[in-house]
Amino acid sequence: MVLSNKKLKQRIRQDLAESLSVSVSETNPQSQSLKLLLDSSSHKPRLSKREKRRNCETFAREDDEIRENEVGNGGSSEKTDTKIKKKRKRDDAVEVDELEGDEGTKEEQKPQKKKNKKKKKKRKVNKTPKKAEEGNVEEKVKVEEIEVNTDNKEEDGVVPNKLYVGGIPYQSTEDEIRSYFRSCGVIIKVDCKMRPEDGAFSGIAFITFDTEDGAKRALAFDRAAMGDRYLTIQQYVKTTTPSIPRRKTSSGFAPEMVDGYNRVYIGNLAWDTTERDIRKLFSDCVINSVRLGKNKETGEFKGYAHVDFKDSVSVAIALKLDQQVICGRPVKICCALKDRPATDHTPGETNNAGSYNMEDTYAAADPVPALAGRSEVDDGNYFATTVSSSKVKRRVCYECGEKGHLSTACPIKLQKADDQANSKLGQETVDGRPAMQSYGLPKNSGDSYYMNETYASTNETYNGGYSASAVGTGKVKRRNCYECGEKGHLSTACPIKLQNTSHTNSTLDHQTVEAGPTQVTSYSLQKKTRDTENNGGSFMDESYATVPISIDVTNGANDASLTSAVSTGKIKKRNCYECGEKGHLSSACPNKLQKQG
């Protein structure tokens, strides 16, 4: 006889209960552990590992017996084996619960599990339509975004399939333009712009494609060569209201109103704007004059004007008319900048940079030293080096400790340097006299005129102040003379060199020949030498000046030139083409002059 699963479980539970009751009766009540006491109080018996193993063995034996009985009865054992195996795993995991003997609880748990499974299935079924709904919502959002973008494009005036093309060769035709952009797509329209003056092609065209993709392909031809020109391709922007001009946003710069200055600047005027149009705009204001900005050379209008009003009330009314349309263009109206006079010496302003005089400003703070060179002051180098910027005014002089000048331009330092230079000049240079004109030259027995010229550094001192050779700057004072090796003068003003040249020139005086009367200058300057015994000094006589040259002594002395009289260094190095000797030119050769005489 085949037993059902419920009956098998009931039988097994009865056997377990009997075995438990027998084991409890056999155990000593005194040796009961704490766990057993707790189990008895909670009515939940707990089995040890050994008892669990024994129960498992008994369960296995009983199952084997049941199977044998089923086979003997001719029942199908395959189905029961699979069911028993599945159930056995559950029984092993829930052995403790089975021992409780609560059949009702397990029967209640099964329908709850089934309910939970049904709920899960319902949730899954409900999730799928939600996902579908979410997908539909996302698609709707995307469609809305695309619509918004297209609306924005239309509002901005961007036409996706129309392009602006510039830089087209002037001799190109519409067919040539179509053939050039044929690879991009189907061209619907080509609008070529012509010049209004002569009706010739201006090199600009608007091309409309069939699709937006064709326009995108054509944008790749930007900066491409077409003939001898390069193309400029941009997206076409459509103006929503072409009749009304677009107002330009102002840059934000607006000069402030100045009391008593009622001039207004008007910019962004059309080229055909006249004075009548401006007066019509300011009809509510009292206008004194209107000046249109024009090119001085061509007289063409430059697109701006200045209007002078009678009072500040008219200026305030005029400023409110900013961005009003005149001749199709919105004009800019603001206060004009006030012109500053040239005498306004305000440092730090760019408008007065040309009229700012540094000498007048800093003359009292940093006076020119008494012994400063006249050439430095006249050229403006003194003020350029001493008072160059605000940094110089903040600096302190290392020599005197005062502000306003550098140590290189310190008056005390310059005065000391000039005193030292003057003392050296008193020892090393010659007490000379200013150059004098001499037209009556003494004649020799051979009726020849002589030109006596003596070189002294004192002549150079009279050439507009201190010269570079006698009383130069700090560089001259620090240099050494190449002739004598001493400091304080250059080799061109060395006393020893000048003395030697006087001896060489004296030999030339004896070789000169009588010549015709010539206008020359004689500089008779006595030079001191190092020899204390030679108190008389030496004179240098030069007669190699050319006949047709007339020298203005006063101008030569003032300009510090004396090119014809004081050029011994070059003349001494040259050779005469007539006699082959050094020291004179062919024009002053004694042999040549003798032949001519």
From Swiss-Prot:
Composition-biased stretches (Polar residues): 20-29
Listed Basic residues bias regions: 43-53, 112-129
Localization per Swiss-Prot or TrEMBL: Nucleus; Cell membrane; Cytoplasm, Cytoskeleton, Phragmoplast
GO biological process, one term: cell plate formation involved in plant-type cell wall biogenesis
Motif position, Nuclear localization signal: 112-119
Record PANTHER family: EUKARYOTIC TRANSLATION INITIATION FACTOR 4B/4H, NUCLEAR RNA-BINDING PROTEIN SART-3
Descriptive protein name: Phragmoplastin interacting protein 1
Organism of provenance: Arabidopsis thaliana
Gene that produces this protein: PHIP1
